[in-house]
């Protein structure tokens, strides 16, 4: 399926991991990816474990984990800290649910403002602009 993922240069490594070279360097600066030794007069080489680690970071980012949270998950990656990893995921799930609630409120307020704009077409005052200027708060805006 995949070619040999050992002894890779940074460019080949980045491509195999699905990122660019600057992402690799950024992860190294952040401590998410160890920087391999550089043999005298040679270039650093990366392996399959490095590719797997970068893919892990990208997957965790897609789930909404911050780089600090990902660093913590990587620290727990020895298989003996499932409870701690689960706790981190539970906190992230709660954050996601709170954001979804906030987004639903925002959607309601924006929908009302758009409707009000369409209903008052031709009037001098736009309800959306007036609301954003603080002249009149739409229903539910205080909850956002």
Curated annotation (Swiss-Prot):
Disulfide bonds: none annotated. One of its GO terms (biological process) is response to mercury ion. Mediates the mercuric-dependent induction of mercury resistance operon. In the absence of mercury MerR represses transcription by binding tightly to the mer operator region; when mercury is present the dimeric complex binds a single ion and becomes a potent transcriptional activator, while remaining bound to the mer site. It comes from the Bacteria. Residues 10-29 bind DNA. This is Mercuric resistance operon regulatory protein. NCBIfam families: MerR (TIGR02051), PRK13752.1 (NF010315). It comes from Serratia marcescens. Signal peptide: none annotated. GO terms for molecular function: DNA binding; DNA-binding transcription factor activity; mercury ion binding. The gene is merR. Keywords: Activator, DNA-binding, Mercuric resistance, Mercury, Metal-binding, Plasmid, Repressor, Transcription, Transcription regulation. Pfam families: MerR, MerR-DNA-bind. CDD domains: HTH_MerR1 (cd04783). Residues 7-76 form the HTH merR-type domain.
């Amino acid at each position: 399926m995949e070619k040999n993922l050992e002894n890779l240069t940074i460019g080949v490594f980045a491509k195999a991991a699905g990122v660019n070279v600057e992402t690799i360097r950024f992860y190294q600066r952040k401590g998410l990816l160890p920087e391999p030794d550089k043999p005298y007069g040679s270039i650093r080489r990366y392996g399959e474990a490095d590719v797997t680690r970068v893919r892990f970071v990208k997957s965790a980012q897609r789930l909404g984990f911050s780089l600090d949270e990902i660093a913590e998950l990587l620290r727990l990656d020895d298989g003996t800290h499932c409870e701690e990893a689960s706790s981190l995921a539970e906190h992230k799930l709660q954050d996601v649910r709170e954001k979804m609630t906030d987004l639903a409120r925002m959607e309601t307020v924006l929908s009302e403002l758009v409707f009000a704009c369409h209903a008052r077409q031709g009037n001098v005052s736009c309800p959306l602009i007036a609301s954003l200027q603080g002249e009149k708060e739409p229903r539910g805006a205080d909850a956002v």
